[in-house]
C-alpha cells in the first residue's frame, strides 16, 4: 500500500496540531519523509521569474554604497567582562514572576529585582541549536537546518568574533561533549575556546549523567577558568550552556527538596535554578565580579507543542541583564527575541559593531 503515501496527506485536516502530528507519526509519513529528504525552498520563499531575479542581483552588485550596517554608539565604549548563560529548557512559565506558584525558581525570581528584565522575550525555536544560533549570530532562524549544524559555518560575524576583535578572550563552556549538535565545529571555527567535558580532570567531576557533568561542576569549572583569565588583564567573554534540566532529570543528591531519583521535570528546573544561584554567589566572591555583566536567558522552552501552530506561551523564555556596576535594574515590556539580546547589551555598553 506504499503507493498510497501521497494520498495519506489528506487526513491532516484537524485544527489541533497534536492530532495532525499523531496521525503523521507512522509508516506512511516515515517513508514519504525518507523519499523527500530535501529542503523544498518553494515552501519557504516567494520566488520571482529568473530574468527579474537576475536583474535585481545585477543591480545589487553594481551598488556603490555599503550593503551592511555599522552601528556606532554615541556613548563611551566600555569593555567589562561578559558572561552569557543559556539555561537548558527554561520556560518563563516556571517562574513566579510569570504566574507560577510552584516555587521552582527562587534564585531567578529574586534576581529579577536586581537586573534589567525583558518580560516579553521569545525563543526563535524549540531546539538548543536554534537558541545558540540566535544569541551567537543575532540572526532569525533560517529554513531547514540551523547554521550551527551546517557545513561551511566558520568565520562568521558572531558575538564572539566581534568581542575578540575588541581584545576579549572568548570561551564556550559546555558540560557535555561539544561534538553534540556540531557545537565543537561551529564554536571552534568561530574563534571560541571550547571548555567541555573532555577538559575536566576526574576530581573536577562530582556528578554526571548521559548529558554530561552537573551544572554545579560546569559552573565551578567556569569560576576556576575565568579567575585565571582575569589575572591576564584582558576582558573575557564566556558563554555557558547548562545541561542538567534535561531528561532524565538527574542531579546531585541533597541539593533541593525534590529527591534526585524522582527524575521529574520540576526537579530539573529547580536544580538548574539552584546551580545558577550557586554560580552567581561564587562569582560575587571573585575579584572580577564588579567588572562583569551577566546575561541570563534560555535556549528554548521545556516544550513547544500545543493546539495551535505556534503556541506563543511555549516560546516565552526568561531574559535579563545583571550588572550592578553597569546596568540599572528595571523591566522592558516590549516584545523581543533572542536575536535582540546581544545587540541590546552592546548598546548599553556603548559598543560599536
Language-model-derived ranges and their functions:
Residues 1-80, 112:
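N-terminal secretory/membrane-targeting segments
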Residues 58-353:
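Solvent-exposed soluble domains appended to multi-pass membrane proteins
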